[in-house]
């Protein structure tokens, strides 16, 4: 996409792949992951490496948002390469990270930068960013204000939920108690985590195998949230079986859902 007209910006936590970012002219600002005594850019190493570190050391990797310096580096490069071109920054939920605040600090004095909180993470954010990228590709005359208005409409409509494969990382990070963790393990309980007004909230509990609860969510979530059937974005993490993914697709197609897009979660979520 031609970035001489309008530039889209998002964090690596959107889980937009480098290939999709390049194809759609999206600038990705790295978030960060700390483990093993060092801090690395999210997306600069394979996700399984982080899981293996935790299994070996039982030390939870820490994630952190983009710093003002991260954004300053990007803004300065864009100033050199595309002077004066408007920048629309579609931010990872500001309830969960400091990234948006960092961007606002770095953008001080730059009148060409407009920031919007997507109130979403991972695939929810990706859906908004990539949909706006498609709008700009199909309608290159779109102004910054028009793109921002379109993004606001998407932000209001996005509904997102996911089911963790297990609660080890949530327990290690202090997000669930030991009692709740043990109860979930014994009873085979899997919480549904929804993104509500930018926050990660447990809204429902499923019981059974991962395959069973994923299929139950697939049956219930689209109808409960009145999701539009012409485009669904599906989130998966390392370890989700191909058989489950194919069954999910088949079931959603039976419901009349089209244009299914899978997004693999990275380290941050």
Map each language-model feature to its residues.
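N-terminal glycine-rich anion-binding loop in soluble enzyme alpha/beta folds
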Residues: 7-70
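Short catalytic-loop micro-motif centered on adjacent basic/acidic residues
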Residues: 8-9, 62, 89, 115, ...
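Glycine-rich phosphate- or other oxyanion-binding loops that anchor nucleotides, phosphorylated ligands
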Residues: 57-94, 101-102, 148, 155-158
């Amino acid at each position: 996409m031609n970035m001489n007209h309008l530039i889209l910006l998002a964090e690596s936590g959107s889980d937009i792949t480098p290939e999709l970012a390049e194809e759609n002219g999206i600038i990705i600002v790295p978030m960060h992951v700390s483990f093993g005594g060092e801090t690395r850019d999210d997306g600069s190493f394979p996700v399984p490496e982080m899981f293996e570190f935790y299994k070996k050391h039982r030390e939870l990797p820490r994630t952190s948002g983009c710093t003002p310096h991260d954004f300053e580096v990007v803004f300065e490069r864009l100033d050199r390469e595309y002077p004066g071109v408007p920048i629309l920054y579609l931010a990872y939920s500001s309830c969960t990270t400091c990234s948006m605040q960092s961007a606002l600090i770095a953008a001080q004095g730059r009148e060409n930068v407009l920031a919007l909180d997507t109130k979403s993470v991972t695939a929810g954010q990706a859906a908004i960013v990539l949909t706006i990228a498609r709008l700009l590709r199909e309608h290159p005359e779109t102004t910054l204000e028009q793109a921002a208005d379109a993004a606001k409409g998407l932000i209001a409509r996005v509904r997102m939920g996911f089911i963790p494969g297990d609660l080890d990382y949530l327990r290690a990070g202090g997000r669930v108690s030991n009692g709740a963790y043990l109860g979930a393990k014994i009873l085979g309980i899997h919480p549904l985590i929804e993104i509500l007004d930018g926050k990660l909230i447990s809204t429902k509990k499923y019981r059974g195998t991962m395959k069973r609860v994923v299929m139950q969510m697939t049956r219930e979530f689209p109808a409960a949230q009145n999701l539009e059937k012409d485009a669904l974005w599906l989130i998966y993490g390392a370890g989700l079986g191909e058989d489950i993914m194919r069954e999910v697709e088949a079931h959603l197609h039976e419901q009349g859902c089209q244009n299914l897009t899978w997004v693999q979660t990275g380290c941050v979520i």
